[in-house]
UniProtKB/Swiss-Prot annotation:
Residues 80-112 form a coiled coil. Residues 73-83 have a biased composition (Basic and acidic residues). This is Uncharacterized protein DDB_G0277209. Keywords: Coiled coil. The keyword Coiled coil applies. Residues 62-72 have a biased composition (Basic residues). Residues 62-86 are annotated as: Disordered. It comes from Dictyostelium discoideum (Social amoeba).
């Protein structure tokens, strides 16, 4: 790692530690208040993560904007959802085909072993 990457990593760690220091600094003593505070803190963290993901993807092309929006929010345009679902199905089909090929190769290998065992037994 070069020096700039190390500095970036240190800054990330420092920012994370500041967040947790703030979190534990304001932690109430009452159990009910503590639960509410933790739930609120978790919700804000999720919102911040979502905003960061959106910022990263929105810098790209318009297609990226539309795809990330569809992932986070249900769209009224059913055709776009169908396209998104069909891509998922295509990926699943490809995965299943790969698994099928692996199983077929294993079966063929086992058949060859069985045949070789028969030949060896006949020789003995």
């Amino acid at each position: 790692m070069n020096q700039q990457e190390l500095i970036e990593e240190i800054n990330k760690i420092e920012s994370c530690s500041l967040v947790f220091e703030r979190f534990f600094g304001y932690l109430p003593n009452d159990i009910k208040e503590r639960k509410q505070y933790i739930l609120k803190f978790n919700k804000t963290l999720k919102d911040e993560k979502r905003k960061l993901k959106c910022k990263k993807t929105f810098k790209g092309e318009k297609k990226n904007k539309k795809q990330t929006f569809l992932k986070h929010h249900q769209s009224d345009d059913h055709s776009e959802n169908k396209v998104y679902k069909s891509k998922k199905l295509e990926k699943k089909i490809q995965q299943l085909n790969k698994k099928k090929q692996l199983i077929d190769t294993k079966i063929n290998f086992l058949k060859e072993i069985k045949e070789s065992n028969k030949i060896n037994k006949s020789k003995i």
